[in-house]
Regions:
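Conserved cytosolic headpiece of P-type ATPases
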Residues: 1-364
């Protein structure tokens, strides 16, 4: 006021005017425009953003925690290998075209030539929540409703002379224990010619733990002498990046009142290895994330060997990487988990949904 020779009132009005002028009333518009431009650019790179404010959050991402099945891979399971009675059977490249061909040592075998194989396929069709839908017209293809793993089992059965619908009609389901990430297995109960059959499918460890015998040439033999061969074959299949399911059963004269309690003394039937190929665009996407300073961690319920094989295939993992299983994660306190998260290459395998949540919280 002394230099401008203003009265007190005029000076006060000038001060208020300057204060108002200093407020960036165009800031919101500027930020919104910048975010909108970023959103359009991300859309050009196949990234869909529903909320504008999420663009800013995505810009600060430094770690991606991703599942394997259906994210890194296509989520399209196809049966590749069966293993029954110490015999590996190639059942790959099947999808409702020509009659399915199975091979042992490069030699074709006819469907039904191995009774244990046929029974194992029947178990896969019974312990199953999927459904095959026939073609609706000329030129139309078969469709499968349900989980990709169930779909692979149904297709393998259909291609090798086992009609899933016929099997399910002959042995109607009377009870089910759905797949549980903690149990890592599923069980169903069916009426059967010989009484009642309990069908079980899931990860090898929990299934084999409940088995007391092994199916060989149509009869149950002691498991002890065959356990190591089963475990060795699973190791071989998982190293190839295959998801491996174990199938087992038990026939009882009367229907049990408690299916969970009856899951003991099972007969091991066989293994089925399923291939889920990586998405073709994943390798480049992961490399772009790496160049941007974003680290990728795989968090999956699959076997450690399967996860590492797929991760190596997409260039995300090598022999120097670290793998932590769900059982190992249980022994880690928050401090040790935080230290483990600093590993440049990291896979969490055989983890439950609750453990996945814990991992993401620790990353934050």
């Amino acid at each position: 006021t002394l230099f401008l020779h203003l009265e007190a009132l005029s000076a006060a009005l000038l001060m208020i005017g300057v204060m108002v002028a200093c407020v960036p009333e165009g800031l919101q518009l500027t930020i919104s425009t910048a975010l909108a431009v970023s959103l359009v650019e991300m859309a050009r790179n196949n990234v869909l953003v529903k909320k504008l404010a999420a663009v800013q959050t995505l810009g600060s991402v430094t770690v991606i925690c991703t599942d394997k099945t259906g994210t890194i891979t296509k989520g399209e399971m196809t049966a590749s290998t069966m293993w029954v009675d110490r015999t590996a059977i190639d059942v790959s490249d099947l999808w409702f075209g020509d009659e399915g061909q199975a091979m042992i040592g490069g030699v074709n075998i006819s469907p039904g030539a191995i009774p244990d194989m046929e029974w194992t396929l029947q178990l896969g069709a019974l312990c199953n929540n999927g459904k095959l839908v026939p073609p609706t017209g000329p030129g139309k293809a078969w469709e499968v409703l349900g989980d990709p793993t169930d779909a692979a089992l149904l297709v393998a059965a259909k291609e090798h002379g086992v009609d899933p619908e016929e099997v399910q009609r002959a042995s109607p389901r009377t009870a089910v224990l759905p797949f549980d990430p903690t149990r890592m297995m599923m069980a169903t109960l069916h009426d059967h010619d010989s009484g009642t059959v309990i069908c079980v499918k899931g990860a090898l460890v929990p299934v084999l733990r409940r088995c007391g015998s092994y199916l060989s040439e149509g009869r149950a033999v002691p498991l002890n002498e065959n356990k190591k061969a089963i475990e060795d074959e699973e190791a071989s299949l998982t190293k190839q990046g295959l998801r491996v399911l174990a199938l087992a059963y038990k026939i009882v004269p009367e229907r049990p009142s408690d299916l969970a309690a009856a899951e003991s003394g099972l007969t091991f039937a066989g293994l089925i290895g399923m291939k889920d190929p990586p998405r073709p665009e994943v390798r480049e996407a992961l490399q772009q994330a790496k160049r941007a300073g974003v680290r990728t961690i795989i968090v999956t319920g699959d076997h450690a060997r399967t996860a590492s094989a797929v991760a190596k295939e997409v260039g995300l993992f090598d022999d120097e990487g670290m793998i932590i299983t769900g059982e190992e994660l249980k022994t880690l306190d928050d401090g040790k988990l935080s230290d483990a998260l600093d590993a440049p290459q990291l896979i969490f395998a055989r983890v439950s949904p609750a453990q996945k949540q814990r991992i993401v919280s620790a990353v934050k």
